[in-house]
Amino acid sequence: MTVSSNAEVGPAGELPAEQVVVAARMVREGRLISLASPRFPGMPLFPGHPPFQVLNYRTPRGIRVAGAQPWGPLNDAGLGYMAEYVMATSHSGAHMDALAHMTVADDMHWFGGGRADEHLTDFGPVHGDASKLPPFFTRGVLIDAPAFRGVDCLPKGSPIDAAEMEAICGAEGVEVRPWDVVVVRTGYMGLWPDAERMAAHQTAGPDISAARWMLDRGVIAAGSDTETFEVQPAPDPGPAGNPQPVHTALLIERGVYIMESLDLEELARHKVYEFLFVALPVKIRGATGSMVDPVAVV
């Protein structure tokens, strides 16, 4: 298992200041493109996660009936407020996996020396959890697989291998460099939120050769528009039959962050293949990821 000098943060924690400056200089138009779709109760999610829910906690009518105004007696202005519970996994909609999200082997280890027997409490992991997620302000690259293939959306279980990643970059006129964030479009979010249509296209994505291709180029994070990032079922699970070899290679072995359920449709429509990538994960102690609303700045 790889152990980094940034054991709880990974290579993204070593982003050089000069790379931040170079990324900032990429902005030419000042246009902001959101890479996330709205979240809502009943939204499509990976089946291993709990459903997303929003419930009222206080309403203007409710506080009057209950006499529960936090500022004392009913005011002449009739001031009220609304507050809510949001109950959800941190892996709802566009999100980033913390390093303490996936484990492997009998010792249930994760990147940077984390192990379930030592670092997993009843209130979540204490090593490599979401409170350690760094901010991202670096160059982003879009790899648009359906545009390259001339289709709207990749077919169910279609792998994107290293050779195709390289060919797409050539067609787009971009190259992947150290410190980049790579986002891979399959067209899946173009079907959002029609769960029935989406199910017919689950789940295309990078295979293990594509993961190694990204590692060879020094990326610090990678994302896609599907719930699993990598192609499922894995065409090359290895001798141990690992169902998610890409997560293992990137997140567990090298500390490269993975994002899922990104909305890359507007980037693709405008043929924006390189951009300033900005993401500010929410630092929640004990969480295994963070909902994010990343922005591509053009």
Predicted regions and their residues:
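Active-/binding-site microenvironments in catalytic and ligand-binding cores
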Residues: 1-298
